[in-house]
Amino acid sequence: MHKMHTNKRLARPLRSVMVAVLCALTLLACREFDAPEAEQSLPERVNVSIAHLREMVGERTVHFEQDLVIGGYVTTSDREGNFYRTFCIDDGTAGVEIMAGMYDLHRLYPEGYYVTVRLNGCSAGVHNGVLQVGTRAAAYSNYPTDYFYSRVLIDKHLTRYDLISPVAPIPLRVEQLAEEYCGRLVNVSSLKLVAAPEGGIWSGYCTFADEKGHRVAVYCSPYADFAQQEVPTERVSITGILQRGEVDGEDMYVLKMRYESDCGIYN
C-alpha cells in the first residue's frame, strides 16, 4: 500500500511535466506554421526590377521559365480585411501584387519586411492597372493569374528576410495619378467626399474630389472591419494602393486603403 501511494505522488508531477512539454510543442508548431522563419543571410540576388518586369509583361499575361528574381518591401496588410489573400511589395521602381492565396498574410509577410520572389514557374499580368504575380490562370479565367494557394508552392517561390524598412507613401495630387504608380502606396490630400454608398459608409466605392474638382475613387471591401463605418465629410488625406478601374461606368483611379486609419482629417 505504501508503494502504490508513493507512485501516485510521483505520477502527478510527471503528468504535469508531460502536459507542459506537449503545450510547448503545440505552441511551437503553431508558430512555425503561422510565420515562416525569416532568412538571416543576405537576400538572394535580384536580377530584374519590378518596373522592368512590368515593361516585359505589358498588356499580356506572361509565364516565366527563366530564373528571374524580384524583391521588395511589403506595403500592405490584410489585418483589417480590405486586402484578401494578396499582398504588395515595392522595390522603389514599381509595385507588384503577390497572389498568395493564404489568410492572415500580415503574420506571414508583415508590412515593411523584405521579400524576394522567384519567377520561374510563375505567371504575371496586369489587373485593375496593377501588376500581379501568381500561378498560371485557367484558360476560362477572366483574370491574368491565379493564387499560389499551397504553402509549399509559396515557400518555393517566396522568401521573407529579416530586413525591415517601412515604405512611405508617395505624395501625389489627383492630376498626378498615373499608370506608373498603380500597385504602389500613394497618398492624396485635401479630398472631399462627393459620393458614397447608401448610409454614407465605406463599403463599396466612394468618390472624392480635390479643391480643383479632380476626382478619385476609394474602394472598401464589404468584408473589411471598417466597411460599416461612416465616411468622414471633412477634407481628408487618404493613403492606399493605387489601382485603376471602372466605377459607375467611368474609368477612374482608385485608392485601396489598408486600414481605416489610412483616411485622416486634412489640416
Q: What is each stretch, according to the model?
A:
Residues R31-N267:
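OB-fold nucleic-acid-binding modules
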Residues H2-M18:
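Bacterial N-terminal signal peptides that target proteins for export
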Residues T26-A29:
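C-terminal motif of bacterial Sec signal peptides marking the signal peptidase cleavage site
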